[in-house]
Amino acid sequence: MSMAGAERPVSSAAGLPVRWALAVVLALLAIQATALFAMGRVPICTCGTVKLWHGVVQSSENSQHLTDWYTFSHIIHGFLFYAGTWLLLRRWSWTARLIVATLIEGGWELTENSSFIIERYRAGTISLDYYGDSIVNSVADTLAMISGFLLARWLPIAATVAIAVLFEVLVGLHIRDNLTLNVIMLIHPFDAIRQWQAGPPII
């Protein structure tokens, strides 16, 4: 059973037509991009190209293109935000909860690209070449979260959990980093984890 099938009836005050939700989400994405530009983020990779996929983590082009290994973490963000809003805001429509999720993700993207967090990543994690996201990458990250949110709405709960675990394990074994390790190393870096992350791909 999916969470969508288990939702309670939505009050009229909390309901929001899809077209209006889409308009709000697009406006939030525009605000996110504008704020990032004001913060000094570059619109696209300084290499002058925009790639659909860039798979080299230890590279100055990481987090500069449309998708990369960390895109999977943002899809998981969508899973988590759907579950969280489903638990806390059950009487809200899924469209209203999507707006909440987009606000949270956009807020994180702005925080992640602040000087404090960038330096935190560089000092405490393996991301020595990280100098912040390009605007196109940051917006694509939010779109990845939205895709995860929508997947969680339609997939059975067991399938959503299985996909999240699969992403974490496979990405972790390949680049020695994932959402879980990223959060741990951001909050409290461990030398043992940092040393492990310096190794080659396991798969």
From Swiss-Prot:
Pfam families: DUF2585. The chain crosses the membrane at residues 20-40, 69-89, 155-175. It is a multi-pass membrane protein. The keyword 4Fe-4S does not apply. One of its GO terms (cellular component) is plasma membrane. Keywords: Cell membrane, Membrane, Transmembrane, Transmembrane helix. Disulfide bonds: none annotated. It is found in: Cell membrane. Belongs to the UPF0314 family. This is UPF0314 protein Rpal_0309. It comes from Rhodopseudomonas palustris (strain TIE-1). The lineage of its organism: Bacteria, Pseudomonadati, Pseudomonadota, Alphaproteobacteria, Hyphomicrobiales.
